[in-house]
């Protein structure tokens, strides 16, 4: 539905559906051997990097499992956000290279109440993805929308969430 809303608002959408595309999230020995140099043995990495290079905005939509993103998305970030492409080492840590991305939006769904996720479980998505990856890689504007709790959400609540996310893109 979010893709339909974005397209309806005039945005061009390049949807990455990692599972449907058969993305392999596993960092194998050959990948690890070239990791520090920003090299990957997986030919799909350059393909995904080119798609991100063409983007102005990134939207991540995923459920939170065991307080973090699913392994498929984590593996995507590990393999695709490489040294020299997404960031480069600097004397102060890293210098982000994805500065062409105007904005990233992270939309998550979980059953844990938002207050518990933040105060009891340490807000892992904020630390790992928003600050620890996207901002570190040069994306200055990152918005996170946590839809919660989903287990008992009514249809009306779910529709309100879709409208909330759509409104972020002028839909």
Regions found by a protein language model. Give the residues of each.
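Short, glycine-/small-residue-rich phosphate/pyrophosphate-handling segment
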Residues: 88-135
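Glycine-rich phosphate/pyrophosphate-binding loop and the adjoining helix
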Residues: 119-171
């Amino acid at each position: 539905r979010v893709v339909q809303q974005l397209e309806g608002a005039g945005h061009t959408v390049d949807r990455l559906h990692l599972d449907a595309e058969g993305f392999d999230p596993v960092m194998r020995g050959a990948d690890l051997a070239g990791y520090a140099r920003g090299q990957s043995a997986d030919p799909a990495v350059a393909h995904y990097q080119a798609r991100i290079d063409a983007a102005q905005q990134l939207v991540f939509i995923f459920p939170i499992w065991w307080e973090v993103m699913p392994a498929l998305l984590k593996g995507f970030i590990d393999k695709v956000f490489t040294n020299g492409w997404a960031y480069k080492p600097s004397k102060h840590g890293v210098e982000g290279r994805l500065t062409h991305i105007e904005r990233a939006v992270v939309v998550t769904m979980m059953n844990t109440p938002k207050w518990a996720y933040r105060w009891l479980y340490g807000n892992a998505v904020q630390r790992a993805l928003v600050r620890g990856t996207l901002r570190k890689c040069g994306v200055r504007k990152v918005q996170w929308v946590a839809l919660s709790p989903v287990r008992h959400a009514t249809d009306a609540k779910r529709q309100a969430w879709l409208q909330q996310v759509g409104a972020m893109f002028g839909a």
